[in-house]
C-alpha cells in the first residue's frame, strides 16, 4: 500500500474515533484545579515516580524539566538510571517561555543551537556540533519513533515534553532519516489527562501576531478507560520582521484506551503555516569577509515572495501485558508534507558592502513517510541479577518528490534591500526524486547488580538501508543497498543515593555515499558511515535541583573527492566536549535552567591537506545558556524571569577563512499567577533580545547563516475554565 494511502487510512480512523467519542466530552468542563498554583505546574505531574517504561516521568522541583526521558526502544528511564546525557523540557516550561515551536524551546539548551532563520520556513539544529534536520526528511522523533513528527517545523501546542538525547542514538531509535548523529530530539505528545481540563491561551507577539490556543482533555467510560484530548490554535499577523506576515493553524487530537492489560493511543496532527516575505539564509562568496549583520527587523527577501507548508501526521500505538513481566508493543503511522513557495533560494553576499545575488524560484516539495515497529519487553532475574530486555523490529519508508522553476537574477543589499518587480513563474511539475527504506532489528538488556546500584546496558542493532534515486524520466538512476551492525555499552554506578557515575559507547549511522559521476570510480557504493561516541559523566541530585557533567568525543567519517579524482572515505570530523547542565530550584523561590558546553571540533582527516586540523563549520568553542526565575516575596504569584544565550565565534567554511563573530542575547520577562473570577489565570510578558543586538546566527553545515532575532515583545494570558 502506498505511503499516502496508509496515512489516509490512519487519519480516517482517527476522525471516526473522534466523532464517536464527541458526545462524551462535549459537555462543559470543570476546572482542572481550584488553585491558582495549579496553572503554573505541569498538567501531567504525578505524585510518585513512574512505574514503567511507557509511563510519563515526574517533574523535577520547580517543574522546568522532568527527571526522566524516553530513550527510544529502552522506554522512559529516570535520569539517574540513564547512561546518557538527556534533558526533558516540560509543558510548563514550554508555556512559561512562550514557545511557539520546538526550536524556541531548545534555544535554552547549552548543547543545542538552532540553525534556522528568524521568519524562516524550516527549523534545523546543531547538537554537540553536528547537524540535525537540514534536509527534506524530518529528523525529529515523535513518541519515540521517526516518521511522524511534522517534517519542516514542529509546534509546541501538541507537545507535553520536548526531549533531547545528546549523542548518537542509532541503537535506540534506528538510523536517523537524514543521517544526523549529534543527538535525538523527541516530542512527547499531549495525551488525555486523569482530570478534566479546559484551558485557553491568548497570545500576542511583535508586531501584530495575535493567536489563541485551546487545550481540552476529557475521560469517560465506567472506569474512565477512554480519553480524548484536543489542542487547536490559530495565529496570524505581522511578525517582528518588517513587511513579513505569518499565519498558522494547528489541530491535534489524541485518543486513548487504558484497560487492565491493553493500552492503546491514537494521535493525529494537521497544521498549515503560510508566509509572505519568508526569510532565507545567506552564503558568502569566496575571499569575502563576513560583513556586519543587519538589524534582524530588516526585511531582506522580496516582499512578493510567499510560502505554504501543509503537514498531516498520524500514529497508532499500543501495548499488551502478556503477564506481569512480559509486554508486547507496536506502533504504526506516518506523515505527509506538502510545500510550495515562490521565494528566494539562498542569496549570496558578494562583498563587504553587503551586495547580494539571488535567483528566486517556484518550488514544490512532497514528502511521504511511514513507520511501523513491533517489540517485546521482558523483566526477569537470574539469581541476584535483574534484567530488563527488549527485542524490537522497525521499518521506516520515505518518498521525496520535487519540482523547481527558476526565475531571473535579483541584485540587492543586506543593509538597503532593493524591491524588484514581481516575477511570474509557472508552477513546476513535481517528479519523484528519491525513496528510501530503513529497517532493523535490535536487542537490548539492562542488567542490575547490588540492588540496582550498578546497571549495565548492552545492545546490538542490525540496520538495513536501501535507497533509490530517480531521473527526470522516472527511472532509477542510482541504487544503494547495504547494512551495518551497531552496538551499545552503557554503565551506571551509584556510589551514593544522590550520585550517578556513567559511561557509554554508542554509535550513529549515516547512509553511505554513491561516488558521483565526476569521480573516476563513479557509481561505487560505500558502506554506512559509523560515527563513534565515548562519553563519561557524573550526575548529582540534591533535593530540588540536579546537575550533570559530561565529557564526550564523537568521530564522524564521510566521503570526499580526492585530488586524484577518486571518491573515498577520507574525511572525518571529531568533536570533543565538556557539558555542564544545571536544573531545578537552587533556593526557595529561585530556579535555574542552563549550563555551558565547551567544544573542541577538528577536521582530523580531509582530502584537502590544508583543511586538516581546522575547525568544522558551525562549531563554536563555547555555548552557554542561563534562564532564571525568582518568585518575589512582595507579591504572591509574581515571578521575575530572565536569561542569556551566548555563542562563541563560528567558521562558515572548512578553510577557516570566514568567521562569524561571537554573540550574546539577553531576554527578560515577568509572570503573574492569580485568580480572576475564581478561574486560575497566568499572565506572561517576555522581551527577547532586550538590547536589540545585531548579530549573525544559525550556521548550517553547508555554511549558510542568517540574522538573529530582533527585539520582540511577547504577551500571553492563560485561563483554566
Segments the model singles out, each with a brief description of its role:
Residues 451, 553-555, 569-654:
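Gram-negative outer-membrane beta-barrel transporters
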Residues 317-333, 337-345, 501-502, 527-605, ...:
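Membrane-embedded beta-barrel scaffold of Gram-negative outer-membrane proteins
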